[in-house]
Amino acid sequence: MPQSKSRKIAILGYRSVGKSSLTIQFVEGQFVDSYDPTIENTFTKLITVNGQEYHLQLVDTAGQDEYSIFPQTYSIDINGYILVYSVTSIKSFEVIKVIHGKLLDMVGKVQIPIMLVGNKKDLHMERVISYEEGKALAESWNAAFLESSAKENQTAVDVFKRIILEAEKIDGAASQGKSSCSVM
């Protein structure tokens, strides 16, 4: 097996959309039912995707809102971003659009690996954002999209595998686009 690659992924979104629950479900395989606002946590996990082992460093950020100022650390050495909203919250869906815009401004690149996640899909009766709305938003960003339920462990692993694939796809395109110049 090839040597493992290190990848750093930031998880961003409005408060109480399930960023920490999704991350803990992926890393530890358990659902934390209580809500304790996150300041910032970092988790690590080894995962194999398409035969390649990855050492993931996951930055679980504090909830942002439309007025949040992004710390510069959110753009340094980050290989991909998971943007999470709750399918039960119009506010979180609107704020994720603002977060995306701020992220593009901060990173300064047109194409960055982004995975849009509609979380809490198990709460059928409270749903206010349709699957189609989430998918359309992701397509407008040229981003990957999944809905998830951290509580029922639906697609948690898929979310993190997919962002790795998105990061590798963009890294591959960037390295193919590089030109070499020789001065003689």
Swiss-Prot record:
In which domain of life is the source organism classified?
Eukaryota
- One GO cellular component term: cytosol
Q: Name one GO biological process term.
A: positive regulation of TORC1 signaling
Q: Spell out the SMART domains in the cross-references.
A: RAB, RAS, RHO
Pfam family, any one? Ras
InterPro entries recorded for this chain? P-loop_NTPase, Small_GTP-bd, Small_GTPase, Small_GTPase_Ras-type
Subunit architecture: Associates with the mTORC1 complex (MTOR, MLST8 and RPTOR) in a guanyl nucleotide-independent manner. Interacts with TSC2. Interacts with MCRS1; the interaction maintains RHEB at the lysosome in its active GTP-bound form and prevents its interaction with the mTORC1 complex inhibitor TSC2, ensuring activation of the mTORC1 complex by RHEB. Interacts (when prenylated) with PDE6D; this promotes release from membranes.
**Assigned protein family:** Belongs to the small GTPase superfamily. Rheb family.
UniProt name for this protein: GTP-binding protein Rheb
